[in-house]
Amino acid sequence: KIICPGFIDPHLHPSMAAVLLPMEFVTAMRWKLPWGEVEPVTDPQGFDERMAALSTTGPANEPRFIWGYHQLWHGPMSRARIEAIASDKPTVVWHRSFHELYMNAAAMDMVGVVAAEIKPGMQIDIELGWFFEGGLGYAINRLNPWILAPDKYAAGLQRLKQVVHYGGHTTIGDLATGMFNFSAEAEALSQHLEGED
């Protein structure tokens, strides 16, 4: 009997994937996922139309997370642009690189962003609602109650498992466990990803 391993991905960041996969995808590329296909959105108008449609869904007291924005296709992003479309629906537009995100005022209020705490060099532009690189950490710490909510994070890990198997991978690795919350991530990763499947 010959056993051949599947693909190995040593740089997947399971926690990052578990956070992203439950989000609404609005991307310039087509995504074929086990639970459906996401058609590409390749211009600012299309992005705004999709954001407008998403802003009317879900509970009013829950932030809307949109992943996949990129300025080359979707144009410049800002707090004002989000507010012109999503109004007072708390909305987070996460860049496809994962290294930056934008929030409208409703989202910043909901998660407790305090303008007086923002100092020069923090890589945060409060007027644009833009949190990038180091400033992303500030935003993530405030978004954790939503992105790491046990049911949402567990659902993201289950989606990750589906995606990994869908792509023919049998082994994944991560060098960034703990980027959100080490103990919560380690426990959930062990519970949902360890095992025979």
Each predicted region: which residue ranges?
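Divalent metal-binding segments
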Residues: 1-196
